[in-house]
């Protein structure tokens, strides 16, 4: 019988988030694993969501996202970070990080390419890269500072390197890379 998963996903087990969720349920604990607050959402947010559905905003959105939301994201980036973006061509809205990452890896990586990831990292990086038939190259960031050393990063780069996954603040460390690390 053929295994249920493709060979590209062999060796990837349950995510740490699924394990934490199961343990929290089993022991009646608060789940700090992945956005499970122990309080209800604000009523005004729930009311706005219900009103939007009543007003007919309950169909599939355009592939890149609703234009008003794309504009709001571009405005936010300009206002807070001084980054000018064209909402129609440079902002894509996605319903979740994991799906967005997989789509990005599939769009940017060819079979045999390498993607550098800084460790510790979000556990969806490796399987997403594997689905693109590429290879994750891990660059460890040593605790407690989790600093990115330019020499360590440079040593990981090969002719097959196509992508550097740079997430700041880091997930799960929360570490924000400083200007000297980003410039190196």
For each of these PLM feature ranges, what is it?
Residues 84-91, 111-114, 160:
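Short acidic capping loops at alpha-helix termini that bridge into adjacent secondary structure
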Residues 8-96, 103:
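N-terminal small-domain helix-loop-helix segment of the aminotransferase-like
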Residues 137, 141-184:
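Active-site phosphate-binding strand-loop segment of PLP-dependent enzymes
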Residues 107-129:
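Conserved PLP-anchoring active-site segment centered on the Schiff-base-forming lysine
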Residues 131-137:
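A short helix-loop-beta submotif of the ANL/AMP-binding
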Residues 36-37, 98, 168-172:
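Short glycine-rich anion-binding loops that position phosphate/pyrophosphate groups of nucleotides
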Residues 23, 104, 152-156:
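CheY-like receiver
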């Amino acid at each position: 019988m053929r295994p249920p998963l493709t060979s590209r996903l062999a060796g990837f087990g349950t995510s740490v988030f699924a394990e934490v969720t199961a343990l929290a349920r089993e022991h009646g604990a608060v789940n700090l694993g992945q956005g499970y607050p122990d309080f209800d959402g604000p009523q005004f947010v729930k009311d706005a969501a219900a009103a939007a559905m009543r007003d007919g905003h309950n169909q599939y959105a355009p592939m890149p996202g609703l234009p008003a939301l794309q504009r709001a994201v571009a405005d936010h980036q300009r206002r807070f970070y001084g980054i000018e973006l064209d909402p129609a061509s440079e902002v894509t809205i996605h319903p979740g990080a994991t799906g967005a990452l997989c789509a990005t890896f599939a769009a940017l990586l060819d079979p045999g390419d390498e993607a550098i990831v800084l460790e510790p990292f979000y556990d969806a990086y490796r399987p997403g890269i594997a689905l693109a038939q590429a290879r994750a190259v891990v660059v460890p960031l040593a605790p407690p500072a989790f600093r990115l050393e330019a020499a360590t990063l440079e040593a990981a780069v090969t002719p097959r390197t196509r992508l550097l996954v740079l997430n700041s603040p880091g997930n799960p460390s929360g570490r924000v890379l400083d200007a000297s690390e980003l410039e190196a």
